[in-house]
């Protein structure tokens, strides 16, 4: 099974290599990061770096070349500045990010919770974004630069809010779209199960179930084409062991869904019930007091 999967992956990579264009771009910044970026006929970047952090540097540069808009909007979002651009709709997310004080959390735990290896990759990625800004000195997103490694880490933390549904619940509260006690009590979980089956798919098919004896991985994560979690396709490899192709999010230095010569991996998204909202009864005589039962 593993052998056949390897053959399938190697075959896929071989086909991809045959479609690469002859032109290569080698990028090097002042801090010593260096990567080679080669585009195939579909425009997908194939990125090589001697070290893992060099490959991450190249990934960031290529991604910024193709989709700086979504990367820039993510940085605005991560820094709790969405309200400045989106008004009230963005202010809900800003409030939550500031209330949870992610900056202090990351500052306190950056070195203790992340290995040196991971930090180097993140720092290489941030350097790649900043180098793109340096090369494209007339771009219209200058205000988000420089991007720091902690900005990248903050993106991972905040994405948990998106996938858990917390951010959308806070936004719903701020917009005043709350349900009355009568509405809540009259709703049956069994009658509303259709609300809880929205999600995405990842299916592995073993060789005994395929007509050619291959192992296949089918991934449909139902991600949007725009925004903070829009997929971007790339192939990244390094002399330290990286060799992976698949999709990543704007501002992320790793492949989230994809394959290498040994394995394939996917990611799914659903709508789990992870948030509880409590409506307080405010003292009409003093808005700073609420009923404690």
Task: Label each region the model flagged.
Residues 8-16:
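Bacterial N-terminal signal peptides
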Residues 234-236:
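A glycine- and small-aliphatic-rich helix-loop capping segment at beta-alpha/alpha-beta transitions
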Residues 20-22:
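Boundary at the C-terminal end of the N-terminal hydrophobic targeting segment
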Residues 244, 249-293:
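Compact, glycine/acidic-enriched structural inserts
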Residues 1-7:
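Bacterial N-terminal signal peptides that target proteins for export
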Residues 24-228, 239-241, 245-254, 259, ...:
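Substrate-recognition/specificity elements adjacent to catalytic centers across diverse enzyme folds
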């Amino acid at each position: 099974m593993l052998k056949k999967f390897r053959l399938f992956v190697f075959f896929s990579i071989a086909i991809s290599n045959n479609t690469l264009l002859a032109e290569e771009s080698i990028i090097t910044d002042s801090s010593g990061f260096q990567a080679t970026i080669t585009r195939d006929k579909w425009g997908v970047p194939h990125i090589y770096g001697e070290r893992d952090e060099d490959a991450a540097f190249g990934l960031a540069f290529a991604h910024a070349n193709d989709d700086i808009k979504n990367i820039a909007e993510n940085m605005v979002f991560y820094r709790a500045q969405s309200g400045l651009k989106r008004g009230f709709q963005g202010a809900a997310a800003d409030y939550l990010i500031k209330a949870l004080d992610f900056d202090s959390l990351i500052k306190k735990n950056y070195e203790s919770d992340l290995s040196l290896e991971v930090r180097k990759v993140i720092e290489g990625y941030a350097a790649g974004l900043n180098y793109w800004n340096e090369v494209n000195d007339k771009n219209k997103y200058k205000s988000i630069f420089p991007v720091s490694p902690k900005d990248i880490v903050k993106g991972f933390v905040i994405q948990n809010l998106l996938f858990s549904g917390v951010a959308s619940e806070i936004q719903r509260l701020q917009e005043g779209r709350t349900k009355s006690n009568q509405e809540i009590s009259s709703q049956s979980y069994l009658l509303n199960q259709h609300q809880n089956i929205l999600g995405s798919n990842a299916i592995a098919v073993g060789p005994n179930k395929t007509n050619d004896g291959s192992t296949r991985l089918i991934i449909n994560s139902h991600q949007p084409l725009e925004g903070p979690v829009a997929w971007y396709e790339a192939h990244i490899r390094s002399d330290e062991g990286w060799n992976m192709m698949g999709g990543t999010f704007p501002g992320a230095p790793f492949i989230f869904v994809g394959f290498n010569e040994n394995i394939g991996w996917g990611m799914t998204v659903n709508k789990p019930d992870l948030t509880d909202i409590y409506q307080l009864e405010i003292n009409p005589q003093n808005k700073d007091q609420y009923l404690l039962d």
